[in-house]
Amino acid sequence: MKLRKHMISRVLPDSIAEELGLEPGDRLVSVNGQPVEDVFDYRYLMNEELVVLLVEKPDGEEWELEVEKEYEEDLGIEFENGGLMDDYRSCSNKCMFCFIDQMPPDMRETLYFKDDDSRLSFLQGNYVTLTNMSEKDIERVIRYHLEPINISFQAMNPELRCKMLHNRFAGKALEKVDMLYNAGITMNGQIVLCKGVNDGDELEYSLEKLSAYAPVLQSVSVVPVGLTKYRKGLYPLEPFNKEDAEKVLSQIQRWQKIMMEKYGIHFIHASDEWYILADRELPYEDEYDGYLQLENGVGMLRLLETEVKETLEGLSGDDRKVTGRIATGKLAAPFITRYIKEIQKKYPNVQIPVTTIENRFFGEKITVSGLITGQDLKEQLSGLDLGEKLLIPCSMLKGDEEIFLDDMTLKELSEALKTEIVIVDTGGRDLVEAVINPPKHKPTRRRQIYEQTSSSDSGKAECRQIHSV
């Protein structure tokens, strides 16, 4: 078999790799005489105190480098393909609820890529369906003990799962869960709930089946399907209402009691949307079992509130004058307004009203901040008094780039609105500091291997923490 040679795209300053004389454009050929298929092999082979690298320079010269380091110390090398060291595996399903299928045409190409790659599950926390994982893939996960693996279950009824994923192998793919469970590989799960499809009795069946995998399967989130206005020709799905949400929460809470008695964990978690839709208070912090499902919007609002309060406890407050405005999605707006009032108790002259942005681009049913476009911000904020600064969450932007989903740049929006725009990171401290301090431009710090809005498996989506600001 021909050895794969992996192009080095970046060498970090003051790293071991820089000391060795490695440069962008060099190619890694092998580690300890072993070929490197992808990032899994690389990370596994690098977990040694003594490693021998075979590197090919651009002129074809080969260097053999012996490196002594700490066991898990990184060399400081970044590779092409965002560090995956291989092509991305696209999704082989056609899920009835896939968000990418609900997007308008003519957006940037990377937004239409659907992943279903177990390696991204390990590296980034993306959720995978297991339908395109081979036995070899499972064996590698077990051999390298790569965990946690995040799985999009949707339904434990094999026939229904095949229907929902539009993949005749989707039911049989659940057998791979048994292999991971028997090997002790930690897992997290997700169910995208579709009204009249996998809710009610089907959800009950799924929760019962999934509970048997606890505590190796350490958590399962239940999230409502996201529906845009671009669903022509797709499976007819309906949004959940208040009564539906109350039933879902009652069902989940009953299972939480069962799992607490048996394992001491809540195990099943409802995303924040369900509580808002049902007009119920969010659970207490200890009910989230350490916030294992933040990326699915489980507990993000509670955590943000906790962090805001903790940050304010360490501040004495003063009479500084600050003006501005916060723009956020419909889902988070009432909570952000509440947090601003807490800040004003210590900083009474801070005037930062919250503006709820309606998602006209994707449709009013989309209420999360991370799917708001620059055009919607421009249209709905023009003419308003924005004060010294406009605060927006990093979730609105593409990873570590200052560009919105509709390709409007942060600079273009700032010029159109004639104001400084401050990017707020996801933590409560970040929110407090952004509110009480003068405008200071700070680029978003989040990074990702590749761009994705939200595929059928609702993996990490750019910087799309859906409840941040």
Roles of regions detected by a PLM:
Residues 449-469:
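Conserved G1/Walker A P-loop phosphate-binding module
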Residues 148-150, 186-188, 219-221, 267-269, ...:
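Structural preference for beta-strand elements that scaffold enzyme active sites
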Residues 17, 25-28, 53, 98:
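Terminal peptide-recognition signature
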Residues 19-37:
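Conserved PDZ fold ligand-binding element
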Residues 1-12:
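PDZ/PDZ-like groove recognition
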Residues 60-62, 69-216, 226-255:
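Conserved Radical SAM active-site core
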Residues 7, 279-447:
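Radical SAM enzyme core and accessory elements
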Residues 196-197, 217-243, 263-286, 359-364, ...:
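Flexible glycine/acidic-rich beta-alpha junction loops that bind and position SAM and/or redox cofactors
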